[in-house]
Amino acid sequence: MGDFQKVVLAYSGGVDTSACIPYLKNEYGVEEIIAFAADLGQGEELEVVRKKALLAGAKESLVDDLIEPFIHDFAFPAIRANALYEGRYPLSTALARPLIASRLVELAREMEAGAVAHGCTGKGNDQVRFDLAISSLAPHLKILTPAREWSMSRQELISYGEKFGIPAPVSKKSPYSIDLNLLGRSIEAGPLEDPFLAPREEVFQITSSIQESPDTPEEIEIQFEAGNPIAINGVTLDPVSIIKKANALAGRHGFGRIDMIENRVVGIKSREIYEAPGLMLLIKCHQEIESITLSADVLRTKVGIERQWADLVYQGFWFSPLKNALDAFIDRTQLDVNGSVKIQLFKGNATIQGRQSYSNSLYLPDIATYSAEDQYDHKSAEGFIYVWGLANRLWASINRDK
């Protein structure tokens, strides 16, 4: 299928990427495979993953700690954008792909590899995200995609890998396909392919069930500066620690579970389960602090920008000119997004309790109040309403009686 002396493979340790190593060597004639795994805070023993790649036949196996750039450069922009694909999915998995792809391209250049490879199948979104990101960063770099070309079933893939000494990672007791990073978990396949079947509790790992969550509500306060969360309960934290703390707080109370039918890029509807407690909590609070610091017209415009931003990221266009332009709009709005939000966590719910901004609040009590301290000029409303309704009255005077 080609003559590639050296290839850098995006490696996860799963069935597909593990099978890619012997497949690339035997079917593509690749001489050297450098396996690259990204540490995105998934909490797995990545040394095991690294050694597994070597066992499968990789000449070199690398693990890079990308947690800090993942949160600072990808998660925080998503929070500022209130990014929810189809109004529900906070892009916890999608945000990781352009970062992995960019590091893949860097390694290919550093090691003078002739191509890069990934193990994404032809049915999923990740193939699109990887291919678009790689081609945007290195248009002439060859991308090898064996999982789109082989015709093996999942069981055949496992058997294929076992022939080369690769142990099967999926048992009958764990039929799910899972992706995990610091922002959350995505779970699909197995029994979840029946969209009417409730997910078993075993599906969830980082959020408590309603039954097991605390019986007492917990109120917390999250502080924002320029649209970024910077402190929880008065304690200033770095971006990675903010996510970890938010995950622990929201997850303990069972907040952040999502069960949805999702429209994939390739046109397939898919049943997806997500756990993203910290990210969902921070987005909810960020939306609230925006409500008091941004003007009505900016808020209305930003809602449309947010939807388009989430669509672009989901569809693989992280490095597109349009996404960059939307970033510029969002980042400008965030200069005024400063303040704190109080929120109560209890039995799977997160309920806003209050919000304040000392420096940028557009909520003015002297204007909003109905008390004796009201400073709003009520008489001015008459002239405003006359002009505001002028077009309607003109239309009615001409057409109403026809």
Curated annotation (Swiss-Prot):
Keywords: Amino-acid biosynthesis, Arginine biosynthesis, ATP-binding, Cytoplasm, Ligase, Nucleotide-binding. GO terms for biological process: argininosuccinate metabolic process; L-arginine biosynthetic process; urea cycle. L-aspartate binds at T121, N125, D126. ATP binds at A10, Y11, S12, G13, G14, V15, D16, T17, S18, A38, G119. CDD domains: ASS (cd01999). One of its GO terms (cellular component) is cytoplasm. InterPro entries: Arginosuc_syn_C, Arginosuc_syn_N, Arginosuc_synth, Arginosuc_synth_CS, Arginosuc_synth_type_1_subfam, AS_cat/multimer_dom_body, Rossmann-like_a/b/a_fold. PANTHER family: ARGININOSUCCINATE SYNTHASE. Homotetramer. This is Argininosuccinate synthase. It comes from Prochlorococcus marinus (strain SARG / CCMP1375 / SS120). The gene is argG.
